[in-house]
Design a protein with these regions (language model features):
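Compositionally biased terminal segments of proteins
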Residues: 1-130
């Protein structure tokens, strides 16, 4: 397994997503990180935003993320081996007032990533500006 220090954004997101899923928590990547992944970093984001579709307590998520050396400070989780910051915005998974219906599944060497579609990613970024 690749060390966190050597993971790109997609690999790190898949690693976190899989670690959470192995603990019964299904999270979907949303926000700017999706655009970074779909655009091959032509748009760069250092926030890894997951929506927790399992409605798990923040305390439980924090405990699970501690297992992979992520510590919580305010609403963010960080790991000294990476510049990416992880956050869990409140759900439900939606773009504006519309529910997200299409979730993509991307297999990487570090795990499985559940991510909103390219179209919903664009709509999400566009909605964030208005």
């Amino acid at each position: 397994m690749k060390s966190i220090r050597n993971m790109n954004l997609a690999e790190l997101a898949a690693y976190i997503c899989t670690h959470l899923m192995n603990n019964g928590i299904k999270c979907i990547l949303t926000g700017g990180a999706c655009i970074s992944i779909y655009s091959e970093n032509k748009y760069e984001s250092f926030d890894v935003d997951f929506i927790d579709n399992s409605f798990t307590s923040k305390k439980k998520i924090a405990g699970i993320l501690e297992e992979i050396n992520f510590t919580e400070s305010n609403r963010y989780f960080s790991n000294p081996e990476t510049e990416y910051i992880v956050e869990f915005p409140s759900g439900p998974l939606s773009i504006g007032s519309q529910a997200v219906k299409e979730i993509k599944e991307i297999e990487l060497s570090t795990g499985t990533l559940f991510i909103i579609s390219p179209t919903d990613s664009f709509k999400d970024r566009f909605a964030a500006y208005f």
